[in-house]
Amino acid sequence: MSRSGAAAEKADSRQRPQMKVNEYKENQNIAYVSLRPVQTTVLIKTAKVYLAPFSLSNYQLDQLMCPKSLLEKNSNNEVACKKTKIKKTCSRIIPPKMKTTSSKSESTLQNSASAVHTESNKLQPKRTADAMNLSVDVESSQDEDSDEDITPGLDDFSGLSPYERKRLKNISENADFFASLQLSESAARLREIIEKRQPPKSKRKKPKRENGVGCRRSMRLLKVDPSGVSLPATPTPPTLVADETPLLPPGPLEMTSENQEDNERFKGFLHTWAGMNKPSSKNTEKGLSSIKSYRANLNGMVISEDTVYKVTTGPIFSMALHPSETRTLVAVGAKFGQVGLCDLTQQPKEDGVYVFHPHSQPVSCLYFSPANPAHILSLSYDGTLRCGDFSRAIFEEVYRNERSSFSSFDFLSEDASTLIVGHWDGNMSLVDRRTPGTSYEKLTSSSMGKIRTVHVHPVHRQYFITAGLRDTHIYDARQLKSRGSQPLISLTEHTKSIASAYFSPLTGNRVVTTCADCNLRIFDSSCVSSKIPLLTTIRHNTFTGRWLTRFQAMWDPKQEDCVIVGSMAHPRRVEIFHETGKRVHSFGGECLVSVCSINAMHPTRYILAGGNSSGKIHVFMNEKSC
């Protein structure tokens, strides 16, 4: 009976359910441990530990200290409270025989887990709810055998795997190594040395501001020297007056010579004009000469010192030869508003030069009247057009416009009663001398930005040609409108600005233009239609620069198939070209030492006059005419 009862009791003990306690053991990444005991049926004796990986890469030097200091520094009240509760719970559940073994494991595991607890909180602060349940199955009959000793000091971790025990050993060794380096003590000593070397900071005393003195200013602006003495006042520079000559008063001006003091000689000169107040009966309608005879006459023209005259003080802008057959009179317009007249028949030659001042700015255009040879008309940049009457010794005002600047003019009628005037701003004016006053009859604008020259067709006088900025237009005076006029024909072959454009003097069948692209162009204008063809392009250096008057190719009034133009070549010369482009003749000599930009030929006699930029005229003439 006793044996059977013992066997039954032993079988009941095997079938009796055993209690499994979730014992709190500090391990890596343990953030929460359940304190509620769980009853489980234990079939075998097992010990299970769930581990989570972690890293020491985020540890700082002051955190890698000895395990004892780490435990004191990183343990908090929450862990202590949880440990106390677990101990109380386990004491009620674990038998006395089992407490001895559990206390040893708990104390050792607590030390290692507290060191990892800080790292777990830093790496995964949000995962406090993820806890690992460490369950230990305790049998009713616990063996007295102790765990194997693998590593000294780790006897209480016999339930861990060899990897975990090696890992805890490495943690302990690393902590001991960093503790032996004494980094905290070295850092403290270095900090003390740095603080000792820093000089004491001294507070800078702000200077007291003197009463009445504001912001600091330079002595130059205060106009004082370094000693504080005021400097003398800087002399003010003289005011620069604009280089503009005031306009002459409106109305007629008395004709007085600026370079002749002998009034009796000047009066005698004026009386000689009485016999020249009628136009010459000779004309040039007999036809053109042959090129051979024309060249022979040109070869007979010479220059000498007696035919070089100093007339004006500034550059010559315009020139005209009187059509007289008996006297040789050359008129020039200069830069400073002067009009000079040179009588080549007067001896000595200084007595034959007379200079007048009817304008205040450059005289850009000059003509003797075709109806009255005793009249000379001059146009200036100052916006005035005057007529000099030598029989009355007076300069009458024909047209005045102070708001505009004139560039050129020509006669629309043979009796010189109506004029066409070109403006520098591209406008054009019709002027009738028979109308009282000094105003225009019609003012019209053109599509040209600037007008340099105006020339009327010699036969069909209703047509006139204008030259300007890359444009050459032919207009009909009968179709001019106040609101703007459109040209009949435009010559568009030019690539740069055009200095001049002139019809041939007898028939008007040709047009010659002088362009800044170093070309002379001759057009066929025999039929004024929608297009005027280009006949010839003559290569010629027209680049005069800033200080020389621009070249203007002119037709020879006796030979309308030949043009006269100045030259930049050396030695200095004046050249004549045929309309085919061939050079007919070249004027030169020892007395010609400058560039003659403006040239004029006598309408019936073989006399050529050229003006330069110093106010001199050079006259080439036949020896019989000298």
Curated annotation (Swiss-Prot):
Residues 199-208 have a biased composition (Basic residues). GO terms for biological process: DNA damage response; regulation of DNA damage checkpoint. Belongs to the WD repeat DDB2/WDR76 family. It comes from the Eukaryota. GO terms for cellular component: heterochromatin; nucleus; site of DNA damage. This is WD repeat-containing protein 76. Signal peptide: none annotated. Keywords: Repeat, WD repeat. Specifically binds 5-hydroxymethylcytosine (5hmC), suggesting that it acts as a specific reader of 5hmC. Residues 140-150 have a biased composition (Acidic residues). The keyword ATP-binding does not apply. GO terms for molecular function: DNA binding. SMART domains: WD40. Disulfide bonds: none annotated. Residues 109-123 have a biased composition (Polar residues). Residues 1-20, 97-161, 194-213 are annotated as: Disordered. The lineage of its organism: Eukaryota, Metazoa, Chordata, Craniata, Vertebrata. Residues 97-108 have a biased composition (Low complexity). WD repeats lie at residues 311-352, 358-400, 402-441, 446-485, 493-533, 535-565, 590-626. Pfam families: WD40. Interacts with CUL4A and/or CUL4B.
